[in-house]
């Protein structure tokens, strides 16, 4: 299997509407649904929810 089949690169986009994104990898086998994480958004200087963008 290719490296990108199991753990593809995804973008996490801020829900604060700032357009700030994080880039990471996720395991499709363990997490088939879209993920959301609380991460720091430096534009609003707060921790906000970041959701997976497709």
Swiss-Prot record:
S-S bonds? none
The keyword Ribonucleoprotein is assigned to this record? yes
One GO term in the molecular function aspect is: structural constituent of ribosome
| Entry annotated with the keyword Signal | no
**Gene Ontology annotations of biological process type:** translation
Q: Which GO terms describe its cellular component?
A: cytosolic large ribosomal subunit
Mind telling me which NCBIfam families this protein's record contains? PRK00595.1 (NF001860), rpmG_bact (TIGR01023)
Protein name, per record: Large ribosomal subunit protein bL33
| Species annotation | Corynebacterium glutamicum (strain ATCC 13032 / DSM 20300 / JCM 1318 / BCRC 11384 / CCUG 27702 / LMG 3730 / NBRC 12168 / NCIMB 10025 / NRRL B-2784 / 534)
Q: Which gene encodes it?
A: rpmG
């Amino acid at each position: 299997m290719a490296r990108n089949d199991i753990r593809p690169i995804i973008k996490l986009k801020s829900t604060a509407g700032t357009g700030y994104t994080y880039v990471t990898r996720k395991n499709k086998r363990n997490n088939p649904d879209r993920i959301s994480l609380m991460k720091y958004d430096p534009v609003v200087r707060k921790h906000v929810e970041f959701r997976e963008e497709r």
